[in-house]
Amino acid sequence: YAMTSDREAEPVALQFLAKGFAVFVLRYSVQPSRYPVALLEAAEAMRLIRANADQWHVNPAQVAVLGFSAGGHLAANLATSVGDEDIREQGGIDPDAVRPNALMLSYPVITAGKYAHRGSFQCLLGDQAHNQALLDKFSIEKHIDAKTPPVFVWHTMTDDAVPVENTLMLIQACRAAGVSIEAHLFPEGSHGLSLANAETAGNGFYAHIVECVQCWPDLAEAWLRRLF
C-alpha cells in the first residue's frame, strides 16, 4: 500500500499472456490514499472485466486475481468477505458479483497480528493503524469462509519483510474453512522476488535472482488449468 511495483506488473502479465491467458494490470491507489480506495478500485476493475467479457474474450466464471506482498492483501480482501460491506455501501457494487473465481498470492501480507508487516497497515489505515478492531478486520486469516475461492500461494522461508508465517496462517485458515489451497514454500529468497529471474531483478540486484523460485509461474499455470 506504499507503492505499486513495475517489477511485479508487466513482466508477470507477459508471462501469463504467453501461457495463453488474458491479463489485466491494475495500478491501484496507494498512500496517502487510505482504505477503502484501493479495494473499491479493485472491485470496479473486476466489474469492468466481467461487463466486457464477451468483447475481451474472457470467461466471466474463470477470472483469477493475483497479488504480490501488500497487493496480495488487496487481492485477498477482494476474494474474501472482509470488505463486502464497504464494496456494497461505498462502491455501489454487489460484492459477490466482483469476487474472483481464484486467488493467487505471492509472498502476501495476510495478518495484522504478531507477524504483521506493520508498514502495510500504516499505509492502509493511516492514523487508525493502531485501532484493534480494524486490525482484526484486516487480518485475512480471520475471514476465510465458504465464499473464499480456491487459493494458490507461494512464499520463501527466508522472507525478512513479510514473514512466512503470513502464508502459514493462511494455509491453516483455509484448511479450517474447507477452502482449497495449493501452497509452495521455497527454502531461500528475499522479499519481492517477482519472477525471481534476471528480467525482474532490477538494477543488478542479484539477490532477486533465485533459481529454485523461478518455477512458480509454471506451477500456477498448472493449478489454473486443473481448476478451470
Regions found by a protein language model. Give the residues of each.
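Catalytic nucleophile-loop/oxyanion-hole region of alpha/beta-hydrolase
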Residues: 3-13, 24-60, 210-212
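Conserved serine/cysteine hydrolase catalytic core
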Residues: 140-148
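Acidic catalytic loop of the alpha/beta-hydrolase fold
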Residues: 112, 158-162
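A fold-wide structural signal in alpha/beta-hydrolase
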Residues: 17-27, 64, 182
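Short beta-strand/loop motif that positions the catalytic acidic residue
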Residues: 147, 152-155, 159
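C-terminal catalytic histidine-bearing segment of alpha/beta-hydrolase fold enzymes
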Residues: 168-228
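Primarily recognizes the serine-hydrolase "nucleophile elbow" in alpha/beta-hydrolase
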Residues: 44-119, 132-136, 140
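Active-site glycine-rich loops that stabilize anionic/oxyanionic intermediates
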Residues: 1-2, 69, 157
